[in-house]
Amino acid sequence: MATPSHVVSRLTGGRAGNPIVEVIRSNATPTDGDQLEQFVARNRSLIKEFVLVLCGFLVVIMIILFFTLLVAVLTNAYAVQVGRAQFERALQRNYAPPTDASARASTA
């Protein structure tokens, strides 16, 4: 059973009497006549400056993070190098060939 509203809805593509759809169809962009469009139109230069400052701030933070990462990697590499040198010195002390004095004492 078809009601009158169902018939009208089918004839108009299912959007009869919907003011939101009519506004969307009649306006080219979603912000036409909106407060956001008015704000952007009035403050375009302010918004450009704000975005520029924000991007500059993010670039500075990325540079700081890059140098922090660089320092951390170099510090870790130096610590590994020092540890390897200490290990090699300890290895040479423990497994060095006997000197002449200690060889004579052990054979005598």
Swiss-Prot record:
It comes from the Viruses. InterPro entries: Baculo_11_kDa. Belongs to the baculoviridae 11 kDa protein family. This is Uncharacterized 11.7 kDa protein.
